Every structure is written in C-alpha cells, then in structure tokens.
C-alpha cells in the first residue's frame, strides 16, 4: 500500500544516528543523506527523515509524508485528480517519480 513514509525532524544528524541504530537492528543499511533528508531504502519501500520543506520547525505532521503505491502512472494521476476533486489540496509537485 505504501511506497514511502517520511517524517520530519529538527535535528537531522541526531535522527540519522537514532534510525541507523534502530533500523540497523532490523537489517536495514545506514541512511543516505540527500540534502536536507536521510533515506533508508529497502526492497519493499522507503523510510525517510527530513527537515520540513516549508522551512518551519518539524512538529506533529509538519515534515511528514506518506506515499501510496500505484501500479501505473495513470493510476497515480487518477488518484491525485480524485483527491483534488474531493477537496484535497496539492502541497508539492504533482504525482511522479521523485529523484532523491
């Protein structure tokens, strides 16, 4: 169901130290820095820790993202359109492959 989950942090170095240890105990490789984010990739999805893109401090929900997996780009576009039609609001780029 999920392709990725991202949570916010105000201290990326401290978060990386914590998640390297915690996820390492599950056999996950150490996180990889990419700008203001740290990514933990596995065969089944991605967990990431990020400073919020809006520049505000991380708090409950700010800096957090969950990506729903879609079987095709057309389904991802349909999902996005349905969400907007139901009153949702786009907060970042439209659906598509994210580099990083």
What are these regions (language model features)?
Residues 1-3:
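Extreme N-terminal starter segment of soluble prokaryotic enzymes
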Residues 5-7, 66-67:
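Short, contiguous strand/loop micro-motifs
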Residues 10-14, 68-100:
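Vicinal oxygen chelate
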Residues 25-27, 54-55, 95-97:
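Intrinsically disordered, low-complexity segments enriched in polar/charged residues with Gly/Pro
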